[in-house]
Amino acid sequence: MADHPIQGLMKTAMENLKEMIDVNTIIGDPVETPDGSVILTVSKVGFGFAAGGSEFGGKPAEKKSEDDETREQKLPFGGGSGGGVSITPIAFLIVGSTGIRMLHLDENTHLIEKILDAAPQTLERIQQMFKKNNKNQSQGQNQNQMNNMNY
């Protein structure tokens, strides 16, 4: 069976989209600054693709007179396809001698990252509270023992 005309449309559109896509689309090419830091752009990438077509009514299949085999007749076809790409920079990844930093362009949307950044400090505070609580309990037990000895 021959390829359907819409396959050609889809193949062409997908090949063109594929040419636009590479790893540098999301993580940009590194830029080195004079102080030795390296800056990478982090982008949000969105792709869209659509294809459609229609076959119009044609003549019914005809029989050959010599060997009575039916031959397939191609119906008239109309179709189209399209695609689009949206690339939006969302952050810069800065790698320098002081460490790695993520500089977001929209600070309001990164609540989870802020929570993760605060997690070590929060855990440390919780540990300190437990240590104080254990220390207070042990002091309270010692005080109770002392009170029991005095009676």
UniProtKB/Swiss-Prot annotation:
Tell me the first and last residues of the signal peptide: none
Keywords linked to the UniProt accession: Sporulation
Protein induction: Expression is probably sigma F-dependent.
Q: Where is the composition biased (Basic and acidic residues)?
A: 60-74
Q: Which InterPro entries is this protein grouped with? A: Spore_YtfJ
User: Where do the record's region annotations for Disordered lie?
Assistant: 51-84
Name where it's found.
Answer: Spore core
- One BP term from GO: sporulation resulting in formation of a cellular spore
A Pfam family of the record is Spore_YtfJ
> Where are the disulfide bridges?
none
| Domain of life, per lineage | Bacteria
Supply the NCBIfam families for this chain.
spore_ytfJ
Q: What is this protein called?
A: Uncharacterized spore protein YtfJ
From which organism does this entry originate?
Answer: Bacillus subtilis (strain 168)
